[in-house]
From Swiss-Prot:
Biological source species: Caenorhabditis elegans
Protein name as annotated: C-type lectin domain-containing protein 160
Pfam family, one: Lectin_C
Keyword Transferase: no
Coiled-coil stretches noted in the UniProt entry, renumbered to this chain: none
SMART domains in the record: CLECT, VWA
Domain of life, source organism: Eukaryota
Entry GO CC: extracellular region
UniProt gene name: clec-160
Keyword list, A-Z: Disulfide bond, Lectin, Repeat, Secreted, Signal
First and last residue of the signal peptide: 1-19
Sequence ranges assigned to domain VWFA in this UniProt record: 31-178, 289-474
Record-annotated disulphide pairs: 594-614
Main location: secreted
Cellular localization per UniProt: Secreted
Amino acid sequence: MDLKSWILLSCTLLPLSVTSYECYVTPCTRDIIIVVDGSSSMQTSTYVSQEINMITKLTYSWTLDDAKVRLALVGAYLGNEFNGLDYFTDSSLIEKRLQSFRLAAMQYGLFSGDFNTTVRFLDERYVGPRATFGPRANVQKRIIIFSAHKGASDIASTKSKLQEFAQLGYAVTIVGIGVSEDVYKGTFYHKFVSVQWFELGVVAQSIIDTITEDGICFLDQGWTTPKQEICTTSTTTTRAPTTTTTVTTVKGVTGKPATTAKPVPPTHPPFPVGDYQDCSCTTQSLYIDIIFVIDVSEGMGQGGLMMVKAEINTLVGQMSLDPNIQKHVQVGLIKYSDKAEVVFKPSDYTNEDEFTEDLWSDPRLEDVDEKSDEVNLHLGLQQAAKMTASMRNGVRKVIVVYAASYNDEGNDDARQIAANIRETGYAIITVAFVEPESSNLVMKIGEIASPRMNFTSFRDDLLVEQMEDALCQVNCYCPNGWKQLVLENRKYGECFFPTKIDASWTASKFECPVLSKEHTGNGHLVYVNSELKNTFLNQFYMDNWYPENQENPNYDIGYYYDQATKKFIWVNGVTNNPYSNWATGHPDVKQGDCVMAKLLKDSKNDFRWNSVSCTSEYGRGLCQEAACDTDFYCAPSSN
């Protein structure tokens, strides 16, 4: 970003004194509403996630205050409903709110909607005479609507209402995603900003600047520049632009690959796998400790070593090592052949570019050890185990082993120390570098790896995507006391917790958000959308059922009959879930509007759904919450 753009951005969000734009106390004050389009017009939940990334970048450095900038975030059609709370005056709440929107899109999918309903919601909740959350007096007002809607008649039907918004002092900017401005010519707005689908993934600074300068920073007609005063600046730390190296294939490498611009996260947005929510995977938001252990014996060869360095460069270059950023990585590096040596300590680097620069320039990593064709991975893992003790407490740790040779006999056998490391709770990733004509013994190194974390390279392509996924698996876990969904050794972004006292369905419904308040605060009675998940939940509940505490192992689920719509719906708003597991004679709303899973007589873990009273039948609730991952941060003390 050039200096002028940075100054203009800072004007509204980190106020400074600039004569060419509004940098004064009064004009720095705004009431801003941002609408996130979560409808099926966005095509996929991945695009919604990228839309949220753009809004995150737009609002990243904003300093909110009740006397200056206030921000309201509206989720349109996320979870098939509208979410709009009062204006935020605490900047720390922005990311949490946006992440709840992301979770809703990823977990429940997209629902059809229209532009007219979005505008009507804004009128009823924020703009109209009976608005729940009205604006402040004598404050310039802005609405930024992100929209992928394409219905010309639907959009044109909002013209009179948006004209009313303008008359009330609201300047509306439409950020059209994947649509041309011609589609919106039939309505009324202050500014239209066009964003193509591919631009969502790169978040061009020019788009952010246009929204900021033309949609927020400008002075309304009739507002005059007041006496010049320097606005109070924020203490927010903004990360300086960095670069990284991107390599996908290395053949005949002789030096450091060319440096290219750091890719904008997310590198691999989360997406549902089957009936389950996958863990999110934004490499730049990883919060783990990593130790690379590299085989530099003769078997690795110079070409193999160059490939290993290129892969590490690509991975670390996309992470953050800056301790001033909440979600950052610590990295250490050890080399080994017949002996082991620490090359980089975790405390050596707080900048990923410095790490990758030294990765290529440090003389200890320039050549393989041609004097030794022996390997002692046991010593390498010993050094790695010692290094973990110097790293952060409570942070997930992983040891990544790159090996071209392997010895599982005598004192060189690394299997026992690897088992000890895994039992401590640390993960081990192995990458076997195999020459086509060489022995496959090195592929046996996979026996020391954590489940699903053993990989093989035939020295033709890097394994960046597989490695990113494995690192994100390390970064995916549940808050203390919650059970993670794990299928075939694959972790998913869903966590479960049974309430501890008998209570009504209604009481359990309100208890779940309370139990999750230290994490996302979006806990809810469990959503059951497949036979596989139903089986997992039934077994989990039985594993945690104690007859002395609960006579019958029955649990409430997040399903109920809505008297207004005369339909069964889930507490998360889903109405079109095809899966059900009713007991014989159910549902029966005469017995109640809420749903409890009850164990069948003489069965060990076979439950069926029963209609029960929402207030008078008592049982335990089974709560569901998002996992800690690259989207949802858990402090180390929560690990």
